């Protein structure tokens, strides 16, 4: 069974074709600059160098058409015809309260995804364009929607309701939704499998740390709490996002700087985080380099980032009533030896003991805890595409 996984952005598209017999990625690719001058596809067949396909792509339909043509191309293709593709799994960022699991796409589901546009105005329209383009080009192929928010729908009300007038929740569905759900679910399941513990009491804190970062508190495979909120702006300090702050700061800055709501939102989403503090970059690698070279603001940015992660870990340990495993994943979580060490330092009171030698790995599934550590510290590479493919396969079987 071959599953095509599609992740559509506003001007980009990532894809993978996975043979589910042995979970083998046959091909992966990235389409860039859709609807912009200089559009191109970087198409990478397993065991071969990447091929660059440079063609004009005015919209997502044309982009997907070229991707499908590349998949059956006699030189760099991997299937003889579209009939070999059993189903398509689409990443959808926001499923609101309606979708608490992955679903087969039909008219009712499409209407539900469109209703969530208000909650994810940057992402859901792009996801919808990808789905509609695929449906037009592959009308007989089953399609599945896998939602970033679905995994977090098991949170109890006390963890998702904001202390605002309740009517805003009733009228506008303003509440915590959380994101990166597919990644949190993948690594928590992998942790359970690695430690051979699938009990209803297995307590995991998953740290998805990248340019966008979030934590989740998970008990018995179900999400209890997560750090992102109504939008991906809440929670941890990120590449360019502020994370948690005093809400009264917003009107204060808006008055001082004469900013509109949109301009203020742009400051919080695009100019803040470690980029705002350091003034160096939004890329943690650049900031780590600058800090090593003696840049004090770069060092401060890293200190603030790690301190916030530690605070959340301790808070989630309290919510779960203890913790069995602490998982690091995504770009920083999988690859930054120094930041993992910095985050774990000071968590010894929780039973977290990181082994400095075992921690010297990048992007490899590793138990990096000391033998004496009560809490297992795991580094687990995330694989959202595989999770999407697994959900898709389960629904079309």
Swiss-Prot record:
Disulfide bonds: none annotated. Keywords: ATP-binding, Cytoplasm, Kinase, Magnesium, Metal-binding, Nucleotide-binding, Transferase. It catalyses: acetate + ATP = acetyl phosphate + ADP. Pfam families: Acetate_kinase. GO terms for biological process: acetate metabolic process; acetyl-CoA biosynthetic process. InterPro entries: Ac/propionate_kinase (IPR004372), Aliphatic_acid_kin_short-chain (IPR000890), Aliphatic_acid_kinase_CS (IPR023865), ATPase_NBD (IPR043129). The keyword Flavoprotein does not apply. One of its GO terms (cellular component) is cytoplasm. It is found in: Cytoplasm. Substrate binds at residue 91. Its EC number is 2.7.2.1. It is an enzyme of class 2 (transferase). ATP binds at residues 14, 208-212, 283-285, 331-335. The active site is at residue 148. Pathway: Metabolic intermediate biosynthesis; acetyl-CoA biosynthesis; acetyl-CoA from acetate: step 1/2. Mg(2+). Can also accept Mn(2+). Mg(2+) binds at residues 7, 384. Its cofactor is Mg(2+); Mn(2+). The record marks 180, 241 as: Transition state stabilizer. HAMAP family: Acetate_kinase. Belongs to the acetokinase family. Catalyzes the formation of acetyl phosphate from acetate and ATP. Can also catalyze the reverse reaction. Homodimer. This is Acetate kinase. The lineage of its organism: Bacteria, Pseudomonadati, Spirochaetota, Spirochaetia, Spirochaetales.
């Amino acid at each position: 069974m071959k599953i095509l996984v599609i992740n559509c952005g506003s001007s980009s598209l990532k894809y993978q074709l996975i043979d589910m017999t042995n979970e083998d990625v046959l091909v992966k690719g990235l389409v860039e600059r859709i609807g912009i001058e200089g559009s191109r596809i970087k198409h990478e067949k397993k065991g071969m160098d990447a091929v660059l396909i440079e063609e004009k792509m005015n919209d997502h339909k044309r982009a997907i058409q070229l991707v499908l043509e590349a998949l059956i191309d006699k030189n760099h293709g991997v299937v003889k015809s579209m009939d070999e593709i059993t189903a398509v799994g689409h990443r959808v960022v926001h499923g609101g309260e309606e979708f608490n699991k992955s679903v087969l796409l039909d008219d009712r589901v499409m209407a539900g995804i469109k209703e969530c546009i208000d909650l994810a105005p940057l992402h859901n329209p792009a996801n919808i364009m990808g789905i509609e383009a695929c449906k037009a080009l592959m009308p007989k192929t089953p399609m599945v929607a896998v939602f970033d928010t679905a995994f977090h729908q098991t949170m109890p009300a006390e963890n998702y309701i904001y202390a605002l007038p309740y009517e805003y929740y009733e009228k506008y569905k303003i509440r915590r939704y959380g994101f990166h759900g597919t990644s949190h679910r993948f690594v928590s399941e992998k942790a359970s499998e690695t430690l051979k513990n699938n009990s209803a009491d297995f307590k995991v804190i998953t740290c998805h740390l990248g340019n966008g970062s979030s934590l989740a508190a998970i008990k018995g495979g179900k999400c209890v709490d997560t750090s992102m909120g109504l939008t991906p702006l809440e929670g941890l300090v990120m590449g360019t996002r502020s994370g948690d702050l005093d809400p009264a700061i917003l009107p204060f800055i808006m008055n001082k700087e004469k900013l509109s709501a949109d301009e203020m939102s742009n400051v919080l989403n695009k100019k803040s985080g470690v980029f705002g503090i350091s003034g160096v970059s939004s890329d943690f690698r650049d900031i780590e380099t600058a800090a090593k070279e003696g840049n004090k603001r770069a060092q401060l940015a890293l200190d603030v980032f790690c301190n916030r992660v530690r605070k959340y870990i301790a808070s989630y340990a309290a919510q779960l009533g203890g913790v069995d495993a602490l998982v690091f994943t995504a770009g920083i979580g999988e690859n930054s030896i120094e930041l993992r060490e910095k985050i774990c330092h000071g968590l010894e009171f929780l039973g977290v003991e990181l082994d400095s030698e075992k921690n010297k790995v990048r992007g490899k599934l590793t138990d990096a805890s000391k033998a004496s550590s009560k809490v297992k510290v795991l580094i687990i590479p995330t694989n959202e595409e595989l999770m999407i493919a697994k959900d898709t396969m389960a629904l079309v079987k």
